[in-house]
Design a protein with these regions (language model features):
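Oxyanion-binding/catalytic loops of NTP- or PPi-dependent enzymes
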Residues: 1-72, 80-85, 94, 104-604
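Short, charged beta->alpha transition segments
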Residues: 89, 97-104
Length: 604
């Protein structure tokens, strides 16, 4: 039976995922991008442009570019661009068609069966419109499922005790909903949902853009406003991990360039009134379900906007969440995953990818590739693998019920790599060296450029506590399976010792992780800049400035000592490199667009 993929058709971004070798994974495009902007541009001549290229063109021709079409699904059949076949369904179909091409390129085979997600509060007309869009894109839509149900599947919550109730707080780019789910006989049932189809991260972007426009003298044209909006989104994203961001918009008008410092405090003062609107929906959903917040076992955060620290603080406050620490993006609560003091704030799943991953799991169940299992005991400590940079990547979190199965897709870190060392770890620390090593083995695969290989690593613990680790090259099907006996057989004293160590060293561990992750990102930025310079140096006026920015980043990386360095300085240097390479990025995109238009016969 052919694969059934999972699709999150989002307001601002969309994603597609599939289960391979028992592991759900996002299917990235040829450039490694895991999210597709839900943006479609309709040129005056030629075929529509979808995704990243359309988003770039938006700043030049905003009137011919459609964003947030999901907000209009099932509500209007009118074209969103004058003179074009651009109804909400038709725009969504183009996005879904692009996702199909992306999936087929990643998998190397034809796919035409999909599970597509919708907000829980979508009415029948909106659901039918979504299904119609899928069919127009060439998909056989096997099922339309609710986004909160998909998110719960991605979190592995089918292993919760019977009758457990969870809330899914889903704040995306253009929509918000709060859903209360209950697990009944292994199936999630929606007890209540409340939301707003016109409330999301777009509104925060608009508030920032409005604030920025007050810094501009006189009126802006459509292109200027589009540039302001793009800068607003970039600032919002940056301030999820930084306290300060400098917005620079050269020649916003012929005689005016905008440069302004924008802080996290500024962002939160603008965002708070918008986020406070979600509180009413949260309360109403709880009332409709006849519950209070302390009846919940978890509150799951989904949607890219929930990366904002203010969102997490507000949700934790509204739902009276228990004390929690964010470690590796997961939640640690001491001896019990559940807390008597309130629900767990679950931040352990990538908020941008959870819905697509969950939809792919549903697709795998429908195709017979996955089946439900009886869940019994729990894992005493987290299990994972060492990743590039010497960090631990958790596959099965501590206190997961067993039998349990989970996995992730990994890729090669360097060009020409022919094998991957799988180092299996157990523990609660950030750095691999601080956790217990359970074993190592190597899987060979076809030589590929950096990021070209796809190796799935799956952990499966049976009811006897025996861990089997499978690594599979999804291109050739080559695999290795290694049994490990000691994954669950750990004394209470040793467990307590590890947990106490993780708490004692939490801050230094997180500092080390932040540095390593920032350093890896910096290394990628330097490599991309060097590659671009090699191809286009002669066409750039600021090549020397880019060289200097690269040298600044490399100097900070070389001065680091034992996973410790000047993190604020490194982030600032990378931000500077990103800024000075904007002309290079535009040049690369222009050349790519020219090549695409020539291929389509639009240019000679």
């Amino acid at each position: 039976m052919s694969k059934i993929v999972g699709i999150d058709l989002g307001t601002t971004h969309s994603a597609i995922a599939v289960v391979e070798a028992g592991m759900p994974g996002i299917l990235a495009d040829a450039e490694g991008r895991r999210l597709l902007p839900s943006v479609v541009h309709f040129p005056a001549n030629g075929e529509p442009v979808v995704g990243v290229a359309a988003k770039r063109i938006q700043t030049v021709e905003p009137e011919r570019t459609v964003v947030s079409a999901k907000r209009f699904m099932g509500r209007s059949e009118n074209s969103l661009v004058k003179g074009e076949a651009a109804s909400p369904v038709e725009v969504s179909a183009l996005i879904l068609k692009e996702l199909r091409a992306q999936a087929e390129a990643a998998l190397g085979e034809s796919v035409d069966r999909a599970v597509i997600t919708v907000p829980a509060y979508f009415n029948d007309a909106q659901r039918q419109a979504t299904k119609l869009a899928g069919e127009q894109a060439g998909w056989k839509v096997e099922r339309i499922i609710n986004e909160p149900t998909a998110a719960a599947l991605a979190c592995g919550l089918q292993g919760l005790p019977e009758g457990d109730q969870v809330a899914v707080y889903d704040l995306g780019g253009g929509t918000f909903d709060l859903s209360i789910l209950e697990l009944r006989e292994g199936v999630f049932q929606v007890l209540a949902t409340h939301g707003n189809t016109a409330l999301g991260g777009d509104d925060v972007d608009a508030a920032i853009a409005e604030w920025l426009e007050t810094k501009v003298e006189g009126e802006l044209d459509a292109t200027g406003k589009a540039r302001i909006r793009e800068a607003a989104e970039q600032a919002k994203i940056a301030l999820s991990s930084s306290d300060e961001y400098r917005i620079q918009l050269p020649f916003l008008k012929p005689d005016f360039s905008l440069e302004v410092n924008f802080s996290r405090a500024d962002l939160e003062s603008l965002a708070r009134p918008i986020l406070e609107q979600t509180k009413t929906h949260c309360r109403q959903a709880l009332t409709d379900a006849g519950m209070k917040s302390t009846d919940l076992s978890q509150v799951i955060l989904v949607g890219g906007q929930t990366r904002m620290p203010l969102v997490r603080r507000l949700v934790a406050e509204w739902f009276e969440c228990a004390e929690y620490e964010e470690v590796r993006g997961d939640v640690r609560l001491g001896d019990s995953f559940h807390s008597a003091d309130g629900p767990v704030l679950n931040t352990g799943v990538n908020p941008d990818e959870a819905v697509a991953l969950g939809a792919s799991i549903q697709g795998a169940v429908l195709s017979g590739e996955m089946t439900s299992t009886l869940l019994l005991d729990v894992t005493p400590l987290s299990l994972g693998v060492e990743t590039f940079g010497g960090l631990m990547n958790v596959i099965i979190p501590r206190n997961s019920t067993i039998p349990a199965k989970a996995g992730e897709m990994f890729t090669n870190a360097v060009d020409g790599q022919r094998a991957m060392l799988v180092h299996v770890l157990q523990g609660e620390r950030e750095r691999a060296a601080d956790n217990w090593s359970l074993g190592r083995f190597e899987l060979e695969f076809e030589s590929a450029p950096r990021g070209g290989a796809r190796v799935g690593v799956q952990f499966e613990i049976d009811a006897d506590g025996i861990l089997q680790v499978l690594a599979r090259d999804t291109t050739t099907g080559r695999e290795k399976i290694v049994p490990i006996q000691s994954a669950v057989d750990v004394s209470d004293d040793r467990v307590q010792e590890m947990v106490e160590e993780s708490v004692e060293h939490a801050f230094e561990d997180m500092d080390a992780r932040r540095w390593v992750e920032a350093a890896l990102k910096a290394d990628e930025a330097v490599k991309a800049a060097r590659d671009g310079l090699e191809a286009f140096r002669d066409e750039l006026d600021n090549a020397q400035i880019i060289d200097e920015a690269i040298a600044a980043v490399e100097g900070l990386l070389q001065s680091a000592d034992n996973d410790q360095g000047d993190l604020p300085a490194l982030k600032a240097a990378v931000a500077r490199l990103d800024q000075v390479t904007l002309p290079l990025a535009d040049l690369i995109m222009d050349r790519a667009m020219e090549a695409m238009l020539r291929k389509q016969g639009v240019l000679d």
